[in-house]
Each structure stands twice: as C-alpha cells, then as structure tokens.
Swiss-Prot record:
Its cofactor is pyridoxal 5'-phosphate. Homodimer. Binds 1 pyridoxal phosphate per subunit. It comes from Azotobacter vinelandii (strain DJ / ATCC BAA-1303). Gene3D superfamilies: Aspartate Aminotransferase, domain 1 (3.90.1150.10), Type I PLP-dependent aspartate aminotransferase-like (Major domain) (3.40.640.10). GO terms for molecular function: O-phospho-L-serine:2-oxoglutarate aminotransferase activity; pyridoxal phosphate binding. InterPro entries: Aminotrans_V_dom (IPR000192), Pser_aminoTfrase (IPR022278), PyrdxlP-dep_Trfase (IPR015424), PyrdxlP-dep_Trfase_major (IPR015421), PyrdxlP-dep_Trfase_small (IPR015422). Its main location: cytoplasm. This is Phosphoserine aminotransferase. NCBIfam families: PRK05355.1, serC_1. It catalyses: O-phospho-L-serine + 2-oxoglutarate = 3-phosphooxypyruvate + L-glutamate; 4-(phosphooxy)-L-threonine + 2-oxoglutarate = (R)-3-hydroxy-2-oxo-4-phosphooxybutanoate + L-glutamate.
Length: 361
C-alpha cells in the first residue's frame, strides 16, 4: 500500500487506517459469508448482531446509562436541527439556545420554524473568540430544553464545562468532539453527533436520548423523525445506513483497543498542546481564540500575510498534509485533529509550519 497522507479535513474526516484495512479485508466476503456487509439484509441475524455490538461498544465507551436509548439514524446532524424541536418543543413552548458560532446558529434558526427561541447566551459580544460565562446566561423560566454546541468546528471554540440547567433537559450537538474525552452522559437529556468526524463515515447520526423524553413528538412530526418510533424499532423503522453503521462499529472496536475515551483524551491533549504551543510561540502564525475556549479538535490559524496562504497550502499538499484550508466563511487555515489523526501527523504539520516560517517570515 502506498503511504497514506495526513488528512486534516474537518469532515468527512480521517478514519483509523486499521479500521479501513479491516473493512477492506471484509469488503467482498464478510467473515466467510460470501457477501459484503453492503449486500446484507438489515433484518438478517448477521447484521442485527453487527448493529447490536456497535451499540454496546458505544455504551461501554461513553458509560451510557440504561435509561438512555442509542439511535443510529440517517440525515446527519443538520436534520437534527429540525428533529429536536419536532420531538421536544411543544406548541406554544420556548426553547433556550446558546449561540457560539455558525453551527449553533443554524440549529437556532431551524428551531424558530417550530416555536419560540430564546437566545440564552451569545459569543457575539466577544466576536466569537470567547465563550460567555454561565453567569451571563439568561435562561427562560419554563424552557422545553436548552441547546448548545459543545464544539464549533469552523470558529474553533469548545466548551470545557457542562452548563447547569436544573430540571431543564440539556441538548448538545457533539458532532465534532464526541469520543474525544470522557463525558458524563447523565448530565444530558439528548446528545447528537453526525458521524463523519469522530465516529465513522457520513450518512449517519448518533442520537443518545433519555427515555423520559421519548413520546413527546408533535402530531405533525413525520413518522420517520419521531425518536420513539426509531427507538421502538431499533433504529430500523426503514432501512438504515447499514455500511456507515457497520464501519462506525469498527471504529468503536478500535477505540476500545486503544484504551478507550480516557486514552484518547490523553492523546488529544498532547496533539493540541503541541500545535497551539507552536502557534503561540511563533510571531508568524496566530490563533485568536481565548485559551480557555480553544478547541481540541479544530485549530484555526492565520499566517502573517494572507498572500502566503496559497503557497502554504501548495507546500503542505506536496508533503502529504491535506485539507488545511480554512472554512470559506472565515478563511485562513484550519487543522482538524480528530481521534484518528495521530500525533505523528501534528508533528509533521508543525515541522512544515516551522520550515515555511523560516523561509517566509
């Protein structure tokens, strides 16, 4: 096999090489059955076992309590922006939302189609370079839930704390930092995560929902979007994204082999410390995010002169450092260093950044 590049894409993101190699080995003939997972009936004993193991491994990794359902759904995280209010926001009700960047705003804008949204807090006052402390939040008295994004992939802000909401269910978009460090699932009413960053391939979204929040869907909620229907049918009300589910299960196995979420947190800390440390020590590269709000997963940075962006990216690609261009809405650079991106990738990136600075600084 030719040498694999270091992939810093924000999503679809890097997958563990060992996982891809196993999927490759099983692609034509899954465990001697003479067919691919992509050709299996989702109702077959073999596939039901694949799905059940994936769920159990995820439960083990995150310590998911028994009173939570784990759903493997289609539509990605963006579909959840509508699915959440359809299931949790009653007619005439209000939901609290925290605005920390593009993705949290998108979820907020979608929720407004279904009811009243109270912007409980916003990072706008800090130009989205810092998070508003909870003492600044203005929560509704009778909110159906409070929604926030734990990590903003574009802006590079991440919560290192869990909001306190009392009896109000806490709903979180963890698309880009789930499984990157330990969490207490019991603090949340609902967790959702698009798969294509830290879980597996695109086309799948994982929803972890407390059982008491099921059965609240509005009468106009499509059957396909009703969490209770999904839970009652084992995420198989219709044909699921079978291959994405299977491959995500292989990622969960790999994570357990690596030592679980605690071990990944140690690796991720080392990666982000190396990259931020280099940026902060440089007079050539900058990251504007407040230190206590910096993302472990998505590191945006700028060069001293934006005219150097194109040669920087060209040189990076020549060295097998791919997908470092920042999001089109903000520009600059962005290194996404999810679980499957090793320390060796970050070391190679830092070495190139130092070389480029020496030549152009």
């Amino acid at each position: 096999m030719s040498k694999r590049a270091f992939n810093f894409c924000a999503g679809p993101a890097a997958l563990p090489t060992a996982v891809l190699e196993r999927a490759q080995a099983e692609f034509l003939d899954w465990q001697g059955k003479g067919l691919s997972v992509m050709e299996m009936s989702h109702r077959s004993d073999e596939y039901v076992a694949i799905a059940a193991k994936a769920e159990q491994d995820l439960r083990d990794l995150l310590g998911i309590p028994s009173n939570y359902k784990v759903l493997f759904l289609q539509g990605g995280a963006s579909q959840q922006f509508a699915e959440i209010p359809l299931n949790l926001l009653p007619e005439g009700g209000v939901a609290d939302y925290v605005d920390t960047g593009i993705w949290s705003r998108k979820s907020m804008e979608e929720a407004r189609r279904f009811g009243t949204v109270n912007v409980a807090a916003s990072a706008k006052a800090y130009d989205y370079f810092a998070l508003p402390g909870q003492n600044e939040w203005r929560l509704s008295k009778d909110a159906a839930y409070l929604h926030y994004a734990s990590n903003e992939t574009i802006g590079g802000l991440q919560f290192d704390w869990v909001p306190e909401t009392g009896e109000v269910p806490l709903v979180v978009d963890m698309s880009s930092d789930i499984l990157s460090r330990p969490i207490d699932v019991s603090r949340f009413g609902l967790i959702y995560a698009g798969a294509q960053k830290n879980i597996g391939p695109s086309g799948l979204v994982v929803v972890i929902v407390r059982e008491d929040l099921l059965g609240r869907a509005r009468s106009v909620c499509p059957t396909m979007l009703d969490y209770k229907v999904a839970a009652d049918n084992g995420s198989m009300y219709n044909t699921p994204a079978t291959f994405s589910w299977y491959l995500s299960g292989l990622v969960f196995e790999w994570l357990k082999e690596q030592g679980g979420v605690e071990a990944m947190a140690q690796r991720n800390r080392a990666k982000k410390d190396l990259l931020y440390g280099f940026i902060d020590g440089s007079g050539f590269y900058t990251n504007p995010i407040a230190v206590d709000a910096r993302s472990w997963m998505n590191v945006p940075f700028r060069l001293a002169d934006e005219k150097l962006d194109k040669p920087f990216l060209a040189g990076a690609e020549e060295r097998g450092l791919l997908n470092l261009k920042g999001h089109r809405s903000v520009g600059g650079m962005r290194a996404s260093i999810y679980n499957a991106v090793g320390l060796d990738a970050v070391e190679a990136l830092v070495a190139y950044m130092a070389e480029f600075e020496k030549e152009h600084g």
